[in-house]
Amino acid sequence: MSDQQLDQHELQQEENKLIAQRKEKLAAVREARAIAFPNDFRRDAYFADLQKQYADKTKEELEAAAIPVKVAGRIMLNRGSFIVLQDSSERLQVYVNRKTLPEETLAEIKTWDLGDIIGAEGVLARSGKGDLYVDMTSVRLLTKSLRPLPDKHHGLTDTEQRYRQRYVDLMVNEETRHTFRVRSQVIAHIRRFLSERGFLEVETPMLQTIPGGAAAKPFETHHNALDMAMFLRIAPELYLKRLVVGGFEKVFEINRNFRNEGVSTRHNPEFTMLEFYQAYADYEDNMDLTEELFRELAQAVLGTTDVPYGDKVFHFGEPFVRLSVFDSILKYNPEITAADLNDVEKARAIAKKAGAKVLGHEGLGKLQVMIFEELVEHKLEQPHFITRYPFEVSPLARRNDEDPSVTDRFELFIGGREIANAYSELNDAEDQAERFMLQVKEKDAGDDEAMHYDADFINALEYGMPPTAGEGIGIDRLVMLLTNSPSIRDVILFPHMRPQA
């Protein structure tokens, strides 16, 4: 057994000993009272509200006012006369007043452990140091904690354990709680932003018979009653566009997508996506709307449009750079010429040399995108709209009027990561059918991320879809930016993990 394994074994033995002691205490509670886990205590205040409401009250003013309160929370520190509680908003001390609390209550308090949840009544007071606290007149145990909290000096520092036991992580790490409060604020602000502009929030199927709307490998399942294969959706796009056909001219959805792909600091198989569509608009309108949304989000969450991330600062207040795929390759790789990019064999050689997985059947447009992904994407630090993607890799986007080999599409990159994907939607049913057929050929040639042929979607387009622009924004990656989080797992409450050995 290695030294590390020995240390782990000793820690586990110590934890088991503490758990056994706590279970003995719970047994004593069960014996002493009929209900060990009561649910009749009702607090009337949160700690943060008390701190804010009475911030300007002096010790003497609080003493004269004798303001009664009922509070509840988890014991995080026990300093003998003072117990530090934590609720969902803040921490606050409660005072164990030996003059007012009954002897039996004082005896019970001595048996309580860190992690236990209590409910207390008392009056507000302020210490000589200026700290607000509750001078308790009564207190009781509401929930006995059977497992010890992480060591107060080291906390829960093992990253993998933080992800596996998010409930403990949230208990002991304020930074984690802040991250997920910000995530909630971001989603709420997006909803408000779009609703104020006339967008209707909708819900579309998670289980689909044909996985469409993105180039990705789906999760497959089986519907027993219908005896048919079904797929967890990789995107809601084709259903949202059906709604535009039906007459809902501005729609959006914030929900989960599922892609049977690798796990990394940027990817989780289950992730949250915003998709929105607006009729009588194009991809340039969406660029303007996206800039406005991102500026408002940064201002609302951070109080500034300068977004710190690691050792960098992203400037959301400045106009986002707009650059085509083709031009971006030339800008960031001066050794590559336009002639190189327009020659299939030369482009294939460049893509291979850059490390792209070239199969040999790719067209020029696909090769250009491969080169972009390998040689440019990671260099796009400040916000960049990369536009005019080749039509081969944009099977749902409208061709550009001036150059039909590319589409009216953009992807937004910040910090070298794709944050959004948008385009003027293809509403020509015949063109869409042809592109689906090209995707089927790609799939037959070995590309398991190529799209299926969706006959019902073609049927919908044949009824006529107005000129439309659509966009998808990855909520998880956006929250990563706004919370300065290095990994997507930091912003997903329960990320997917390999089973523990």
Curated annotation (Swiss-Prot):
GO molecular function: ATP binding; lysine-tRNA ligase activity; magnesium ion binding; tRNA binding
Gene3D superfamilies noted in UniProt: Bira Bifunctional Protein, Domain 2 (3.30.930.10), Nucleic acid-binding proteins (2.40.50.140)
Keyword ATP-binding: yes
Pfam families tied to this protein: tRNA-synt_2, tRNA_anti-codon
Descriptive protein name: Lysine--tRNA ligase
Disulfide bridge map: none
SUPFAM superfamilies listed in its UniProt record: Class II aaRS and biotin synthetases, Nucleic acid-binding proteins
Self-association state and partner proteins as the record states: Homodimer.
Gene that produces this protein: lysS
Binding locations of Mg(2+) 2: 418
Residues reported in the UniProt entry to bind Mg(2+) 1: 411, 418
Cofactors (names): Mg(2+)
E.C. number: 6.1.1.6
Claim: Nucleotide-binding is one of the keywords in the record: yes
EC category: ligase
An annotated GO BP: lysyl-tRNA aminoacylation
Cofactor-binding details, from the entry: Binds 3 Mg(2+) ions per subunit.
Family per similarity comment: Belongs to the class-II aminoacyl-tRNA synthetase family.
Keywords in alphabetical order: Aminoacyl-tRNA synthetase, ATP-binding, Cytoplasm, Ligase, Magnesium, Metal-binding, Nucleotide-binding, Protein biosynthesis
Entry-linked InterPro entries: Aa-tRNA-synt_II, aa-tRNA-synth_II, aa-tRNA-synth_II/BPL/LPL, Lys-tRNA-ligase_II, Lys-tRNA-ligase_II_N, Lys-tRNA-synth_II_C, NA-bd_OB-fold, NA-bd_OB_tRNA
One of the record's GO cellular component terms: cytosol
CDD domains referenced in this protein's UniProt entry, alphabetically: LysRS_core, LysRS_N
HAMAP family to which the protein is assigned, alphabetical: Lys_tRNA_synth_class2 (MF_00252)
Transmembrane segments: none
Subcellular location: Cytoplasm
